[in-house]
Structures are given as structure tokens and as C-alpha cells.
Amino acid sequence: MVRDKWKDKVWYTILAPDMFDNVEVGETPADDPEKVIGRVLETTLGDVLDDITKHHIKVFFRIYDVEGTTAYSKFEGHRLMRDYVRSLVRRGTSRIDGVIDVVTKDGYKVRVAGLAFTTRRAKTSQQRAIRKEMFKVIEENAKECDFDEFIRRCLSISEEESIPEQIKEAGRKIYPIRQAEIRKTEVLEEPNGLPPYEAVGDRATPELASY
């Protein structure tokens, strides 16, 4: 007689990190709680916050602990959906991309991909200058904030500041900016010196590996 493995599985409720008020974000089945640790949940920020204006933002949570049938997760990164980014492209304008690694005030190393669009085509020198301002804004916020607040600012959900809005304002001093975004973030290292995936005993996901 073939044993039905699904009957042995338990459904675990996944909670978002503290920065998202530990709301329920999904479920995952397993026949052993140890097998739950290290799994990555992909959802949208819109679903997490119950905000239809944020459905273009994918967020990734990695499970690091299980208590009973509750699984606790860490923020691992985010990414703007490709269709959304494509919708921002306009003819006769410039797209300015930049990727920078920063360390938050509490010791998290984060890779951040910024993105800006000008109202018209900018000169190469102007694009370089805007990128420099973009990096300056991101670095200053990282030095000023702990990890949770920095990510909230990247996602424009902080009550204090929005990094995309700061980039837009800083870039306008050089050339008019139509839109600025943080296209992607990825946690590279936690304060313990280990990559987050080693800290929870699992490999990094290919989803977050490419910039």
C-alpha cells in the first residue's frame, strides 16, 4: 500500500517581518518543521499592506524560525515587476540606472538598484551627475537608518522619508526628473557577518541573484 505523504504534512502560517507588523503573508506545507526553515515566499507589497497601489512591487521573505505552526520570516529583498518598469519608459527621455552596496546603521549590507527617468533626453555628463546624486542619497539614508527604516524608505512606505522622492529632488538640480524608483534591493550580509541564506541554512535564490 502506497502511503499518502500529504497526510503527514502540516500547514505552517508565514508571518511577515516586524517592519510589516508581522501580518500573515502565506502558508507552506511540510512534514517536518526543519524543512520549512530556509524557504522563500514571494508575494507583492500590495498583498502585504492591502494596498492596490503597491501590487507592482514583489517582495521576498525567507523563513528563519518555526514555533508550533507559525513560521517567522526575514525580508530578503524586493523587485519592481518588469511590466511596471517598461511602462515608465518614454521616447526621447533618458533612463538612468545605478547599483550600489551600502551598510545600514545597524550593520546590514544591502545591494540597492536605483532608477530614474528624465523628462527629456539628458546629456551623458548629466546622467553621470544624476547617478552620483542617486548614490549619495542612498548612502546617506543607509548611514542614518536602521535596516527596517531603510527598507521602508526604499519602498516609499516610511512615515519619515521616501528615498525615490529624495532622488527625484536631488536629480532635479541637474536635470528635470520625471520618475525615480528603487528598482531592487537584496540583503547581502547581516550584522553577524554571514549572508542571510547561510544564517538560515539554505542557498540564495536565483530570483535575487541577477542585477
Curated annotation (Swiss-Prot):
Q: Where is this region: Disordered?
A: 192-211
Does this entry carry the keyword Ribosomal protein? yes
Q: Which GO terms describe its biological process?
A: translation
Question: Cellular component terms, GO, for this chain's entry?
Answer: ribonucleoprotein complex; ribosome
Report the domain of life of the source organism: Archaea
Kindly indicate whether the keyword Transport belongs to this entry: no
The record's section on InterPro entries has:
Ribosomal_eS1, Ribosomal_eS1_arc, Ribosomal_eS1_CS
Keyword list (alphabetical) reads: Ribonucleoprotein, Ribosomal protein
GO molecular function per UniProt: structural constituent of ribosome
Mind telling me which PANTHER family this protein's record contains? 40S RIBOSOMAL PROTEIN S3A (PTHR11830)
Q: Which NCBIfam families match?
A: PRK04057.1
Under the heading HAMAP family, the entry gives: Ribosomal_eS1
| Record-stated family | Belongs to the eukaryotic ribosomal protein eS1 family.
What name goes with this protein? Answer: Small ribosomal subunit protein eS1
Q: Which organism is it from?
A: Methanopyrus kandleri (strain AV19 / DSM 6324 / JCM 9639 / NBRC 100938)
Q: Which gene encodes it?
A: rps3ae
